[in-house]
């Protein structure tokens, strides 16, 4: 995430555009749950904005990511912000309760609750990366606020660096 990357530039003298420095991110609370059977998430195994709690629900087994029944839940920014300061126990209980209707007859046999501070950039930079000479910033704040955007940004920044190296 950009806010964590800025610390690398503090002693370099590299000046970054103000708009880039002001990039902010929504927080996301997440739950990864291992189940004792199949979930109730419909094919093809993913749901966006399923309800007033979750912005993403993914059945990892249905998507071919896991050999065992496992499901990932990402709470939306509003719900995540509201519950960010809840204790780990309370946060886990609330998100698990909200997830129940997507489990079907399955029970959670193991779970992990996550707080993702820099989850989704609120504003996307207009270019696929930012370069200050040989220092390149890339990621989801440049080419789109999902993993696909981060990958595309990384590819474009790698091409840029390749051109720099190839020209020397």
PLM region spans:
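Active-site substrate-recognition segment that forms the wall
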Residues: 26, 32-84, 90-103
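Active-site-proximal substrate-binding core of FAD-dependent oxidoreductases
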Residues: 106-108, 162-168
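Short Gly/Pro-enriched loop/turn and capping motifs at secondary-structure junctions
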Residues: 78-80, 116-121, 143-144
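Central helical "cap/lid" subdomain
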Residues: 1-44, 105
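Flavin (FAD/FMN) cofactor-binding core of flavoprotein oxidoreductases
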Residues: 93-133
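Short, amphipathic alpha-helical "lid/cap" segments that border enzyme active or binding sites
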Residues: 92, 96, 151-162
